[in-house]
A protein has these predicted regions:
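Conserved N-terminal structural module of periplasmic/extracytoplasmic solute-binding proteins
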Residues: 1-67, 83, 126, 297, ...
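A local structural motif
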Residues: 5, 29-39, 56, 122-129, ...
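Extracytoplasmic/periplasmic substrate-recognition and gating elements
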Residues: 28-29, 33, 119, 254-321
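Short helix-initiation/N-cap motifs at beta->coil->alpha
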Residues: 38-47, 132-136, 220-234
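Hinge/lid segment of periplasmic solute-binding proteins
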Residues: 63-119, 138-140, 262-264
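Extracytoplasmic/periplasmic solute-binding protein
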Residues: 100-104, 136-190
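Glycine-centered hinge/linker elements that transmit conformational signals in sensory
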Residues: 142, 182-222
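Conserved C-terminal helix/tail region of periplasmic/extracytoplasmic solute-binding proteins
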Residues: 148, 313-314, 326-335, 342-396
């Protein structure tokens, strides 16, 4: 129907140009008018809350998991869509057994490595699958130091990286499922779990201590600069950076075509549940369809649009080639061209991704990120950090 118009609220502002071009193409192809606005200044949650208050609500909203949970009563049930069976349900946002959020992209985190730099400095072939334990990692770090790379590691000081990404792996890697993570934090809350006695905590923190020791910003770790870290790994001044595939945005402008990069799981001594074989990640943005302010024709047009993204060549091209995203759907065989995305795509295809634990309080990464910053800066002991984390959860 030529009169149908759908609106989309994009909350990944780095993709706004691609979205606008897509909207134009889509209208030419289908006759459906698509208008894309972008969140500026506000968090996605703040922006969409204001829009629901004013009644100016987009047909499709791109949100984080907590936004979809908050808007559950207005979100269309997508469980019966054709794409649900090929990654939609597995990676989508499911609330009370109903699929409410379409998984827009897969992101995962681990140790980013510069394979080319490692091989040049050590004179040996680098195979990340052979670096499994903390001791394996120490051995390669020492080789790099001996070869002249004085500080082979970068650690971000940002609270989201420390509290939102490194610490949450302790939850996610209890057994690789969101349920296992939930049981673990419930155990901290009721006092039945003590971090100091937990193998995964000790294992990941032993590796963290090692990364701290070889950190290029060791002398002043809380003054580390994210962009400097990105440049250092890209140009081969360092070998390893704890981060995720989103970092390609900062790395790409400095990358040389003949340099090989990838992401590997965090090496650690506790290999239970294949923790050293898996990246932690999952969908990081979801598309939901509003049923309160958008009429049935708009809702159907929005469903058609999501179907087109998954099954139409132009839709697939938008996700993978234009936006450089790792798709959640197994029918899409386009290969992501950026090397970090390619790593994550391979782990996804091999089903070696541990679920992101999303059921975290809104202040988790800020509050516990600040405690992790103290530990990174040697301003507290591991026991004091354990006590801070336990007391945070017991207050929830």
């Amino acid at each position: 129907d030529d009169n149908t118009k759908i609106t989309i609220l994009n909350t990944k502002d780095e993709l706004q140009t691609q979205w606008e071009e897509l909207a134009e193409e889509y209208e030419k192809t289908t006759g459906v008018k698509v208008e894309v606005s972008v969140t500026v200044g506000d968090s996605p949650s703040e922006d969409i809350t204001k829009r629901y208050a004013s009644g100016e609500v987009p047909t499709i909203f791109m949100g984080d998991v907590q936004d979809i949970l908050m808007l559950d009563e207005y979100a269309m049930d997508l469980s019966d869509e054709e794409w649900a069976d090929i990654g939609g349900t597995k990676f989508g946002c499911v609330v009370n057994d109903k699929l409410k959020g379409f998984p827009f992209c897969i992101e995962a985190r681990g140790l980013i490595y510069n394979k080319t730099a490692i091989e040049e400095v050590t004179g040996e072939e680098f195979d990340p699958s052979q670096i499994k334990t903390t001791d394996d990692l120490k051995a390669i770090l020492d080789k790099l130091v001996d070869g002249g790379m004085e500080t082979p590691v970068a650690l971000n000081m940002e609270d989201w990286s420390l509290g939102g990404h490194y610490l949450t792996q302790v939850y996610e890697e209890q057994d690789g499922t969101a349920k296992g993570a939930q049981d673990f934090v419930d155990g901290i809350k009721d006092g039945s779990v003590k971090l100091g006695d937990n193998d995964r905590w000790n294992s990941l923190m032993d590796t963290f201590d090692l990364l701290k020791e070889y950190n290029m910003n060791k002398d002043n770790p809380l003054a580390s600069d994210y962009d400097e870290n990105a440049i250092s790994i890209t140009e081969g001044d360092i070998a390893f950076w704890f981060n995720g595939n989103w970092a390609w945005a900062e790395m790409s402008e400095f990358a040389e075509d003949d340099t090989e990069y990838g992401i590997m799981p965090i090496p650690q001594n506790d290999a239970d549940n294949d923790a050293t074989e898996n990246l932690c990640g999952g969908a990081t943005k979801y598309l939901m369809i509003d049923t309160k302010y958008n009429d049935e024709k708009q809702q159907q047009a929005a469903k058609d649009f999501l179907h087109w993204l998954v099954y139409d060549e132009d839709g697939q091209d938008f996700l993978v080639n234009k936006c450089n995203l790792v798709p959640a759907f197994s029918n899409i065989d386009l290969e992501v061209t950026n090397p970090l995305g390619a790593s994550v795509q391979k782990y996804t295809a091999d089903e070696k991704i541990f679920e992101t634990f999303a059921n975290l309080p809104g202040d988790h990464w800020k509050t516990l990120g600040a405690e992790m910053q103290k530990y990174l800066g040697d301003q507290c002991t591991r026991e004091e950090l354990e006590a801070s984390i336990e007391s945070y959860w017991q207050k929830q």
